[in-house]
Amino acid sequence: QREMKKKGIAVELARTVTATTPTGTGVSVEIGASPFVEVANPPAPRTLEADAVCVTVGRVPHTDGLGLDAAGVKVNARGWIEADDFLETSVPGVYAIGDVIGPRRIMLAHMAVAEAHTAVHNILHPEDRKAQRYDVVPSAIFTAPEIGDVGLSEAQAKQQGFAVKTSVFQFRELGK
């Protein structure tokens, strides 16, 4: 974020675009709190002025036709399958992994593979079930410079009672 800020690029976290309005010189963009990220103090809605807007496409659940209602598997209002921390659905013994469990989890292929391993473990070893961990998955945004993270933020670690020590490594010093 610091490197983006140096380049004059603002990074808005836990936000979503709620409206856009063309202006004579660009576009007015209204942003509000993201429906996909839970934060203690959601940022207040605000309006930004921009030269242009890059639109990215989200995901929708493809659960129609799976017979979830007949099986008794619950889905939320948006159609995502509801699963607990062990990836078990509302029907005991029925597990769900991958994109069908929705955007409150990490929707990437390598995460679905990890979820599959967890679900299979829980099916084969019901006496030793394991919760799927999402706090140790690396994340990256491929911009210049790149933005990435893994694990808890400093604030989250402090909130969970960890003794926190931080240090900084400048990626510009890393050979590519």
Label the model's feature ranges.
Residues 5-17:
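A conserved beta-strand/loop element that lines the FAD pocket in flavoprotein oxidoreductases
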Residues 11, 38, 46-126:
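FAD-site-proximal beta/loop scaffold in flavoenzymes
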Residues 11-13, 31, 166:
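A structural preference for short, hydrophobic beta-strand core positions in alpha/beta folds
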Residues 17-19, 28, 59-62, 100-176:
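Mid-to-C-terminal Rossmann-like scaffold of FAD/NAD(P)H-dependent oxidoreductases
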Residues 21-47, 53:
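Conserved beta-strand-loop-beta-strand element in the redox core of flavoprotein oxidoreductases
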